[in-house]
């Protein structure tokens, strides 16, 4: 039996400096690469937005997988002040085909 599907959105403050070697884009690219690898393995999908020093992300999937993903994000040194904005049960996913889409 499959656990309940959920959609969870959060916002967090990025901790990396704007003058890092390779620029912000390289740091976000590393986050995306890691997210896509992890998420496809556990069937979590969603979209990530980064702008003005903040992340906004929507995650969808099995409740336990999404909550495990959020726990990893909360412990990631690149995020600070993780605030859950929405946590709802869903019948169907909007981002089923995306392990992690990026929006600027």
Map each language-model feature to its residues.
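Charge-rich, low-complexity N-terminal segments
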Residues: 1-104
């Amino acid at each position: 039996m499959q656990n309940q599907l959920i959609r969870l959105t959060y916002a967090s403050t990025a901790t990396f400096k704007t003058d890092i070697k390779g620029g912000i884009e390289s740091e976000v690219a590393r986050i995306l690469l890691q997210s896509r690898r992890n998420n496809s393995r556990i069937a979590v999908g969603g979209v990530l937005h980064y702008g003005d020093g903040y992340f906004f992300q929507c995650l969808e999937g099995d409740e336990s997988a999404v909550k495990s993903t959020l726990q990893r994000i909360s412990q990631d040194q690149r995020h600070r002040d993780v605030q859950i904005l929405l946590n709802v049960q869903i019948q169907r996913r909007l981002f089923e085909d995306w392990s992690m889409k990026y929006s600027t």
